[in-house]
Amino acid sequence: MTSSMKRISILLAFAVALLLTACAQKQKENQSVETKTLVAYFSATGTTAEAAQKVAAVTGGDLHEIQPAEPYTEADLNWRDEQSRSSVEMADKSSRPAVKNTVENIDKYDTIYVGFPIWWGIAPTIVNTFLEQYKLDGKTLVPFFTSGGSDKGETLKYLQPSAPNGNWKEPMNLNGMSQDDVKICVESLK
């Protein structure tokens, strides 16, 4: 093999290596774009979990269930009993029930959908506990809720102080919505 052929072979091998490196880098960039949305939710009965799964499917976001350190029992959720755990927690707006789990590397998310059922006209205080665990400055925070008949009530009034420097959107009522309807709601935010 002549010396010019060797040079050409070396240059071609170098060009192929550069091309493969560029393709691998582009693939990494595309993967990181896909993981910029988090769908965090608290669901006592499963209704909000269903809505969260639809939001995650539409957005391509990662799902995170906000789990109470002490799971709620049926008796805890009895809103007719003023002494039930949920009634006591919701009567004290400063109540912060402990959360069992956390989100690793929350910094990688630009947009966080936060789902919950409406309890007493607002989000359950465990959602405040979740928000207060992290520095969410500059992140887009999109509350969504489910309810047996209530509207958003004063949800934002009580959630915003838990992440005061977040870019809050209006809460979305996703109760009983199909995935197509959820997609319309999510796309209306853009």
What are these regions (language model features)?
Residues 116-117:
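Glycine-rich, N-terminal phosphate-binding loop of Rossmann-like dinucleotide-binding domains
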Residues 106, 132-138, 162-163:
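Short, conserved loop/helix-junction motifs that constitute active-site signature segments
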Residues 19-22:
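C-terminal motif of bacterial Sec signal peptides marking the signal peptidase cleavage site
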Residues 104-107, 136, 150, 154:
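Surface-exposed, polar/charged faces of alpha-helical domains
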Residues 142-178:
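Short, glycine-/small-residue-rich phosphate/pyrophosphate-handling segment
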